[in-house]
C-alpha cells in the first residue's frame, strides 16, 4: 500500500510565491497612486476654501488680495497649511476678466515623492462675463489630480 502524500511539493510552493509576487507588483503601485491622490485632495480642499473670499474681494474692488500677511479676512499664506500642504498663497494680477490666483504648495518632505514641492494653481477667469470660472493647473502629474481640477468650475458672484 502506498503512503498518502502529506504537505505541498516544492513546485506548488514556488507557484504560490510567484502568484503572491505578481499580485504585490500590481497592488503596491496602485496603493502608492491612491495615497498620492489622497494627499493632493488636501491641497485642493485648502485652495478651494479661499475661492469665495478671493471672488468677493475681486467683485468689490477689482483687486486680487495677496496674503503674504494676514489681510482682507484671508489668513497669512503660511498659516493656511495642512499635513501635506506647506502654504496656500493668494495674489495675481487683476484684469477685467479676473486674473486672481490661489496657489497651494505641497511640503518638501513627508509627502509622496512625486508630489514634493508641487503646486496647484486656481486662476479666476471669465469675470467680465457675469460669472466666475476657476481654472485649475498643476505641475504634478495628471494621474494624481482630482477630477475637479481637470475642468473649470463656474460660480456666480
Curated annotation (Swiss-Prot):
The gene is pilA. NCBIfam families: IV_pilin_GFxxxE. Pfam families: N_methyl, Pilin. It comes from Pseudomonas aeruginosa. Its main location: other. Residues 1-7 form a propeptide. The pili are polar flexible filaments of about 5.4 nanometers diameter and 2.5 micrometers average length; they consist of only a single polypeptide chain arranged in a helical configuration of five subunits per turn in the assembled pilus. Disulfide bonds join 64-100, 136-149. It comes from the Bacteria. GO terms for biological process: biological process involved in interaction with host; cell adhesion; type IV pilus-dependent motility. This is Fimbrial protein. InterPro entries: N_methyl_site, Pilin, Pilin-like, T4P/T2SS_Core. It is a single-pass membrane protein. Keywords: Disulfide bond, Fimbrium, Membrane, Methylation, Transmembrane, Transmembrane helix. It is found in: Fimbrium; Membrane. GO terms for cellular component: membrane; periplasmic space; type IV pilus. One of its GO terms (molecular function) is glycosphingolipid binding. Belongs to the N-Me-Phe pilin family. The modification N-methylphenylalanine is found at residue 8. The chain crosses the membrane at residues 8-28.
Amino acid at each position: 500500500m502506498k503512503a498518502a502524500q502529506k504537505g505541498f511539493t516544492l513546485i506548488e510552493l514556488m507557484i504560490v510565491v510567484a502568484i503572491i509576487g505578481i499580485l504585490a507588483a500590481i497592488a503596491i503601485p496602485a496603493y502608492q497612486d491612491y495615497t498620492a491622490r489622497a494627499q493632493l485632495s488636501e491641497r485642493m480642499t485648502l485652495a478651494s476654501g479661499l475661492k469665495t473670499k478671493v471672488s468677493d474681494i475681486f467683485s468689490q474692488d477689482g483687486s486680487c488680495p495677496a496674503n503674504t500677511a494676514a489681510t482682507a479676512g484671508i489668513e497669512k499664506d503660511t498659516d493656511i497649511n495642512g499635513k501635506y500642504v506647506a502654504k496656500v498663497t493668494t495674489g495675481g494680477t487683476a484684469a477685467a476678466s479676473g486674473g486672481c490666483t490661489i496657489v497651494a504648495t505641497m511640503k518638501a518632505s513627508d509627502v509622496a515623492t512625486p508630489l514634493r514641492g508641487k503646486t496647484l494653481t486656481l486662476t479666476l477667469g471669465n469675470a467680465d462675463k457675469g460669472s466666475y470660472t476657476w481654472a485649475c493647473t498643476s505641475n504634478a502629474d495628471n494621474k494624481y489630480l482630482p477630477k475637479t481640477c481637470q475642468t473649470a468650475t463656474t460660480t456666480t458672484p
